[in-house]
Regions:
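N-terminal loops that bind phosphate or other acidic moieties
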Residues: 1-573
Length: 573
């Protein structure tokens, strides 16, 4: 007789913990394998975040039965999900939870476990707009089919048998990804293999299928060659947010996002009123168009994935003070900013730019910042997780976001010692530190440290983000982490000291243009103008002409750059 009659609450928790621990230990391996649908090197991190959200939620909850535990874990996965792979995994766990609602209170027996695995496979397909073979989806389907075959053929199927064959099914799918077109090993398929072997090890720890799977992944990756992107239209930006909506609205949004981008995932669970919290993810060239047309989104984070075209982007108003060129200085460097595959955490300093101006999303992201639109503390914490760097500058845009940034910093610090897990099977301590997950051989490594800059308005935030982006680009390979951090701290300070911010309101466009021109000084090198949504369209050309003439009169026109942006924000609010 099997030692386990049910996959109960304890086993569910152990599964999530073991899977999370495996991904923490070998997330970098998954990251280096990540090329589909875009080489943003984050599958390992995204899956780890999602598993951490599920395990943390279950650890902290007081559940009454298995169905309740599965619901809590899946909800935590949705909130913790990052990226396309995290979204797919969260949708799988939601499907697992929905299947578990009809199970006995003690947990899943073999027949219910197979049904749950099959539901997860369907959930993986449902999570994406354009399912692709040889990826996350294939591995989950193969695992579910192997479990179902065991249920059909074994005279007395046990949980040990079903979980072991499901793990072997996932392993077979990983091997079959070789040569499909996106590299010898797909990172998403590899992640599912680790998750399924972790489940098998819960019921048979001596088997150590996870260790075998890790060795197999390592061996297969040794001959890893340059991957070919399967989809030819992966967007320049990744957009993620949480959104309260009905199932019908979510489906409409999914279809709309499919028209403007790919890697679309809209996942969530609805209640009896057909309302739910959905996690939205898309890769697109038009991040503003990816925002929902109705309802309120929160935790809106946007980051740049790659350059979609070699030529630099143009000024939103089509000019600068020099007349002949449409290119603004920041775009000259940001358009040449290389896509960074397999980014090393220790060599990067993250920048989180807070804004309430949708028109600034693209230039900020192209400067290398993770952009948080309509910031609050939860959104900033999420952005810190997306950065995956031990240090990050937060650039607030107003007094409210300054408070939110400090609250986020306190939140990350307080989470550092909340939940340390001893995974005896893997032999090391694992820490889930808020949304930045790290490990070290001797215990715990530092979580993301947030440094809040003194930027109290949109212009100060924007100019500082430009300066930090340029400093990071010019010194990306010459300095170690400590030196780079010191450089960027000084850059932010010098920028703040040398910056003069003017705010204008009213209907007299000529008066505003002259006021901007009269603010020029002998040492002025850059003028950045943010034009609000309610400002007349003739203000921008008037400012250009007035500043250009004044600069010429002062003899500084050859060294002066004027950048004018339509912020699409009511700056009077």
């Amino acid at each position: 007789m099997s030692a386990h009659e049910h996959l109960g609450i304890e086993q569910l928790h152990s599964w999530l913990v073991h899977a999370h621990a495996a991904c923490v230990r070998h997330g970098e391996l998954l990251n280096t394998l990540n090329e589909f649908p875009v080489a943003d090197s984050d599958t390992g991190a995204n899956v780890t975040h999602t598993l951490a959200g599920a395990a943390r939620a279950l650890t902290q909850a007081d559940v009454i039965d298995f169905a309740d535990a599965a619901t809590v874990a899946s909800a935590g996965a949705v909130l913790g999900a990052r990226g396309n792979s995290g979204m797919i995994l969260a949708q799988c766990l939601l499907a697992f939870s929905e299947s578990a609602q009809n199970a006995p209170s003690q947990g899943l027996r073999p027949v219910e476990l197979v049904a749950a695995l099959q539901a997860m496979a369907r959930g993986a397909v449902k999570a994406v707009s354009h399912p692709v073979e040889g990826t996350f989806i294939s591995a989950m389907r193969s695992a579910a089919q192997a479990g179902a075959d065991t249920l059909d053929t074994s005279p007395r199927p046990t949980l040990e048998e079903i979980t072991a064959t499901a793990a072997f099914g996932a392993q077979e799918a990983v091997v079959e990804t070789v040569g499909i077109g996106h590299g010898p090993v797909d990172a998403g398929a590899g992640a599912i293999m680790l998750i399924m072997t972790a489940l098998a090890d819960v019921f048979n720890p001596q088997g150590d299928l996870t260790g075998t799977a890790l060795n197999m992944l390592t061996d297969l990756s040794q001959n890893n060659t340059s991957h070919k992107q399967v989809s030819g239209r992966s967007g320049e930006f990744e957009v993620m947010y949480l959104w309260n909506a009905t199932a019908f609205q979510a489906e409409r949004l999914r279809k709309a996002l499919g028209e403007i981008g790919d890697s679309v995932a809209v996942g969530g669970a609805v209640d009896s009123l057909n309302m739910g919290l959905f996690h939205v993810h898309v890769h697109t060239d038009s991040p503003r168009a990816a925002l929902p047309p109705y309802g309120k989104a929160r935790q809106i984070c946007i980051r740049r994935l790659r350059s979609s075209r070699p030529e630099p982007a143009t000024n939103p108003y089509g000019f600068n003070a020099r007349g002949g060129s449409n290119v603004i200085p920041l775009e000259r460097f940001s358009s040449k900013r290389p896509a960074k595959a397999a980014r090393k955490v220790q060599n990067e300093i993250g920048v989180i730019a807070c804004t309430r101006a949708p028109g600034l999303i693209v230039p900020l992201a192209r400067a290398g910042a993770v952009v948080v639109l309509e910031p609050d503390s939860d959104a900033i914490v999420r952005a810190a997780g997306d950065i995956q760097n031990p240090n990050a500058f937060v650039l607030p845009c107003d007094e409210a976001s300054i408070s939110a940034a400090h609250a986020a910093s306190r939140s990350l610090t307080s989470r550092a010692a909340v939940w340390a897990l001893d995974d005896s099977n893997l032999g090391e301590d694992i820490l889930v530190a808020g949304d930045y997950i790290s490990k070290s051989a001797g215990g715990v490594e530092a979580l993301t440290r947030l440094k809040v800059a003194d930027t109290s308005n949109e212009v100060a935030m924007f100019v500082t983000a430009m300066a930090l982006g340029l400093a990071e680009l010019e010194n990306s390979s010459d300095l170690d982490e400590a030196a780079k951090l010191a450089l960027m701290e000084r850059t932010a300070w010098v920028t703040a000291v040398r910056m003069r911010v003017l705010e204008f309101s009213g209907v007299d466009a000529e008066h505003i243009a002259l006021a901007v021109a009269n603010a020029l000084g002998e040492w002025t090198v850059t003028v950045t103008v943010l034009v609000g949504a309610l400002v007349d369209s003739d203000v921008a050309p008037l400012i250009r002409d007035a500043v250009g003439q004044k600069a010429q009169d002062m003899g500084i026109d050859e060294d002066l750059d004027v950048n004018i942006y339509a912020s699409h924000q009511d700056l009077d609010q």
